[in-house]
């Protein structure tokens, strides 16, 4: 079962989107695999202290994108393959890098400064 033990809500971002992104990031990083079971909507809402409709909204979006298979009254499972995981990873990275580039340009940083900082932090933040 997918664990939400390290889920940390951020202020200013709707919780349903944070749940969606948490699952997408887990899939992109390989922590969430094809066939992994998601907690029930009721269990996850109690765990996170949010309204069950919030969890339902996140799960519905995951179902609409084909990442989750659910049946009424049954468990929900991840539906992932290599191509899907690559697409998720690409989408997440593009979104994050786009926000970073926008912020750097707004502070007046040039491309060379940005790339230099990226190289420095890449080495420092080795995971």
Please provide the spans of the model-predicted regions.
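A short alpha-helical element within helix-turn-helix/winged-helix DNA-binding domains
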Residues: 37-48, 62
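Extreme N-terminal segment that seeds HTH/winged-HTH DNA-binding domains in transcriptional regulators
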Residues: 1-37, 43, 91, 95, ...
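Short, hydrophobic-biased segments on the C-terminal half of alpha helices
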Residues: 23, 59-60
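A surface-exposed regulatory interaction patch that couples sensing to output
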Residues: 79-98
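Short, Lys/Arg-rich nucleic-acid/phosphate-binding segment
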Residues: 37-38, 70-78, 82-83
């Amino acid at each position: 079962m997918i664990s939400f033990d390290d889920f940390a809500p951020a202020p200013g971002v709707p919780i349903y989107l944070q749940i969606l992104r948490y699952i997408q990031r887990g899939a992109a990083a390989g922590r969430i695999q094809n066939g992994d079971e998601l907690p029930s909507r009721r269990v996850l809402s109690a765990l996170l202290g949010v309204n069950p409709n919030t969890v339902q909204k996140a799960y519905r979006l995951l179902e609409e994108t084909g990442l989750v298979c659910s049946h009424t009254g049954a468990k929900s499972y991840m539906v992932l393959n290599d191509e899907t995981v690559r697409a998720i990873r690409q989408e997440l990275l593009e979104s994050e890098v786009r926000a970073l580039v926008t912020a750097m340009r707004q502070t007046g940083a040039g491309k060379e400064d940005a790339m230099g900082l990226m190289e420095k932090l890449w080495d420092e933040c080795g995971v």
